[in-house]
Amino acid sequence: MQKKRILVVTQHFWPENFRINDIVEGFLADGLEVDVLCGLPNYPKGKWFPGYSGKGPWRENYKGANVYRCREISRKGNTGLRIFANYCSWPLFARFSLHRLPGGYDAILCYNTSPVLMCWPALAAGKKFKAPVSSYVLDIWPENLYSVLPVKNKLLRGIA
């Protein structure tokens, strides 16, 4: 019997410390074949982790999972503008990295950190590979912002 194949789409992945690392390990322990599409590690400080740069590496193996990394603008300095650029760049580069993936997926999991537009590459992958997409949403942004700040502007609330 052929192993089930799953694609995990997430901006943040090992060596960054996120729960998705454990989830991928669980999939592997259950006998699934796992590919991960992710960015280059630079969270939370905004600096590339040792061994990484804007030039890669683009392919790795994490405990048996095939890791495909794509470009992103780092959060360098964690200023509002850099974080915004990071939020916009990763889904765009990830979307245009789908051609590098082998396909044949039975399912796609989007580990969706904020903002919600991070799910765009996973939805595009679902369409391209004709596979169902599930999204694990960790932060409903900017809705969580409105829960702590008194934003009353109807236009801003409508955009959210």
Model feature map: region roles:
Residues 21-24, 49-52, 83, 122-126, ...:
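Short, glycine/charged-enriched secondary-structure capping and boundary segments
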Residues 17, 84-95, 107-129, 135-144:
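An aromatic- and histidine-rich active-site surface loop
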Residues 11, 74-82, 129-160:
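Acceptor-binding helix/loop patch of EC 2.4 sugar-transfer enzymes
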Residues 1-61:
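N-terminal subdomain of nucleotide-sugar transferases
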Residues 14, 42-44, 75, 116, ...:
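Surface-exposed, flexible loop/turn segments at secondary-structure boundaries
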Residues 25, 29, 96, 100, ...:
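Short, well-ordered alpha-helices that flank and scaffold nucleotide-derived cofactor binding pockets
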Residues 5, 106-107:
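Structural motif
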Residues 38-98, 102:
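A conserved catalytic-core segment of Leloir-type glycosyltransferases
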